[in-house]
């Protein structure tokens, strides 16, 4: 009755959205997005408010060769969890079983279903100082010291405004393309 959008179809039915309800302030309570991923296959994204809680991707091939794409790892009603600040705490499609956050709402530990972890250390201003990846019995520590990045105590990269220099092995220069 308040002229709110409840359904949307675009591209000859290749993409549709369905709003399943609004709260008293006019915020969307749930949104389902259907998109055609190939000639006859569709996917489904389900949101609760502005938080994603489920993605069903039925595509078996990539829309683009070697494209970065979503991998539908599980089929559950609630594939994502959030804390009271809206931070993602679980992503079952990526195998993330828990993400804990520090007092600045920055991720401090990410735990995966295979037992692997990523631990982050920050300065008081939120600057990332260290990342520790533990995969099985292998631990890789990356330290961020100004414009120099160290991996397991050895200089790896030197960052500059123009790009970066790979310091491991033979030095290689990589330049950023700036078109502004």
Locations of the language-model features?
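Acidic/glycine-rich beta-solenoid
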Residues: 1-174
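P-loop NTPase catalytic cores that bind/hydrolyze ATP
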Residues: 179-180
């Amino acid at each position: 009755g308040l002229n709110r959008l409840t359904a949307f179809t675009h591209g000859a039915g290749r993409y549709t959205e369905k709003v399943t309800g609004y709260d008293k302030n006019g915020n969307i309570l749930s949104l389902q997005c259907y998109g055609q991923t190939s000639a006859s296959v569709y996917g489904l994204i389900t949101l609760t408010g502005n938080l994603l809680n489920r993605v069903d991707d039925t595509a078996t091939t990539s829309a683009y060769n070697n494209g970065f794409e979503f991998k539908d790892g599980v089929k559950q009603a609630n594939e994502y969890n959030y804390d009271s600040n809206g931070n993602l705490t679980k992503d079952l499609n990526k195998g993330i079983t828990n993400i804990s956050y520090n007092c600045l709402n920055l991720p401090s530990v990410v735990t995966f279903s295979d037992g692997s972890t990523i631990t982050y250390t920050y300065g008081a201003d939120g600057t990332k100082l260290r990342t520790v990846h533990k995969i099985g019995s292998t631990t890789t520590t990356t330290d961020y010291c100004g414009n120099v990045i160290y991996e397991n105590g050895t200089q790896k990269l030197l960052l500059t405004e123009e790009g970066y220099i790979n310091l491991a092995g033979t030095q290689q220069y990589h330049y950023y393309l700036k078109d502004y």
